[in-house]
């Protein structure tokens, strides 16, 4: 296969959507399969309310429970059979919760405040030790109730697992419905989708800035691939790269100052870096091969990328300033779409096995590889910012859908949008708030 055909085959796999039509872009729905070998049994009591909060009666408890459940690490217990439903620690009868085998208990209340504000308070309790693990209060607007529930779930997750939660993060993805493409940003559970930009032409390769305030992406609206950077705060959009030929595959450096990009303006597909304001273009690879899909290591020292310089697509690593590249993958004849785990210890990618494209995870110290997803047409892996889960695109019933799989392969989720295709996922960073 010549290099032009190979380059086209990369993007024939990564680019096209199905021709499905449907309604306007909507929220994603989550289906969960599997769980960790040892799940923590936890009870989340519906929060008591002081004052009238229309339409929000069970939002907090339901969202917290759903978040913990979809992590695969918790077994969320049914609470309706327990007669005493406490909202304050003085009301807790620990024997009631020990009887349903709860190890942890979450209680709380929502209070209306002047000026259309709410005070949300919660406590996480250790049922066995009959003590409080953590308690917090939030002063919010009604529109922040779901986000607050995600934050509470993050606190619970971190307290009980020792790892940072990611429920309050956001995801970006591209949907297609009714012949239009839309770059969407939604909560990590698929709720509250917001359109960043829409077009009659394809949009691909969204990637978050490290501070979570911007998205870089590729749009074909000018009948050629151009890289844009768009602020999620102001909505302002700027052109990052519009050189002769193709401009594709943006990837932010960990400090947010530069992006690695792929250009064909000189000849074949090569990797460059560029300042975030579009200045300071620097060529990093100079080969006769196809070099594409760059991604930075978390420490900023290296760039991993896909290249066919060995005869078939494989993953290579080079210094972030350019220089000699080392091959990183040796299992499989077709390996693309590298992504580094947040701790830099694992490399995720798409590997073709027997005509099936699946997400695989490679330990960079031992070289051990584990196939995580089921295929047959998985693509675009993206790590959660705590490294526990990977989001990726797949095909279900002829439509594009998003899926997530835990880094150990035990927990699998599917996120689908009724009436349209979704793909090109990118999991946003944890933002301090």
From Swiss-Prot:
Record keywords: Cell cycle, Cell division, Periplasm, Signal
Subcellular location: Periplasm
Range of residues in the leader sequence: 1-26
Statement: the UniProt record of this protein carries the keyword DNA repair: no
Annotated Gene Ontology cellular component terms: periplasmic space
Highest taxon, organism lineage: Bacteria
GO biological process per UniProt: cell division; protein import
Assembly description: The Tol-Pal system is composed of five core proteins: the inner membrane proteins TolA, TolQ and TolR, the periplasmic protein TolB and the outer membrane protein Pal. They form a network linking the inner and outer membranes and the peptidoglycan layer.
Functional description taken from the UniProt entry: Part of the Tol-Pal system, which plays a role in outer membrane invagination during cell division and is important for maintaining outer membrane integrity.
Family: Belongs to the TolB family.
PANTHER family listed in its UniProt record: PROTEIN TOLB (PTHR36842:SF1), PROTEIN TOLB HOMOLOG (PTHR36842)
Protein name: Tol-Pal system protein TolB
Organism: Methylobacillus flagellatus (strain ATCC 51484 / DSM 6875 / VKM B-1610 / KT)
């Amino acid at each position: 296969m010549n290099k032009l055909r190979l380059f086209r085959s990369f993007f024939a796999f990564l680019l096209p959507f199905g021709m499905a039509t449907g309604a306007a872009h909507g929220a994603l729905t989550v289906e969960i399969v599997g769980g960790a070998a040892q799940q923590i049994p936890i009870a989340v009591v519906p929060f008591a309310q002081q004052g009238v909060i229309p339409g929000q009666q069970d939002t907090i408890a339901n969202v917290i429970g759903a978040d913990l459940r979809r992590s695969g690490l918790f077994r969320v217990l049914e609470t309706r059979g327990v007669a005493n439903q406490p909202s304050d620690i003085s009301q807790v009868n620990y024997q009631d919760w020990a009887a349903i085998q709860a190890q942890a208990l979450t209680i709380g209340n929502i209070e209306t405040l002047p000026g259309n504000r709410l005070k949300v308070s919660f406590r996480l309790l250790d049922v066995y030790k009959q003590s409080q693990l953590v308690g917090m209060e939030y002063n919010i607007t009604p529109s922040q109730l779901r986000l607050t529930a995600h934050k509470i779930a993050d606190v619970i997750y971190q307290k009980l697992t020792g790892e940072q939660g990611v429920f309050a993060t956001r995801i970006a993805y591209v949907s297609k419905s009714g012949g239009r493409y839309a770059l969407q940003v939604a909560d990590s559970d698929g709720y509250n989708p917001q359109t960043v930009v829409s077009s009659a032409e394809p949009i691909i390769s969204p990637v978050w800035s490290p501070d979570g305030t911007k998205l870089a992406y590729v749009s074909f609206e000018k009948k050629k691939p151009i890289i844009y950077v768009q602020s999620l705060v102001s909505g302002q959009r700027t052109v990052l790269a519009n050189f002769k030929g193709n401009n594709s595959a943006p990837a932010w450096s960990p400090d947010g100052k530069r992006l690695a990009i792929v250009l064909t303006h000189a000849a074949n597909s090569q990797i460059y870096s560029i300042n975030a304001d579009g200045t300071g273009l620097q060529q990093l690879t100079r080969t006769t091969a196809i070099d594409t899909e760059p991604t930075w290591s978390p420490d900023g020292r290296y760039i991993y990328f896909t290249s066919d310089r060995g005869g078939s697509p494989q993953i290579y690593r080079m210094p972030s300033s350019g220089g000699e590249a080392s091959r990183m993958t040796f299992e499989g004849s077709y390996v693309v779409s590298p992504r580094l785990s947040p701790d830099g210890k694992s490399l995720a990618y798409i590997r073709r096995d027997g005509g099936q494209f699946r997400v695989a995870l490679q330990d960079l110290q031992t070289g051990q590889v584990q196939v995580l997803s089921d295929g047959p047409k998985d693509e675009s892996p993206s790590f959660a910012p705590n490294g526990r889960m990977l989001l990726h695109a797949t095909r279900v019933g002829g439509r594009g859908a998003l899926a997530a799989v835990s880094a150990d392969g035990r927990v699998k989720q599917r996120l689908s949008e009724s009436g349209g295709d979704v793909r090109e996922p990118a999991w946003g960073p944890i933002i301090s708030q």
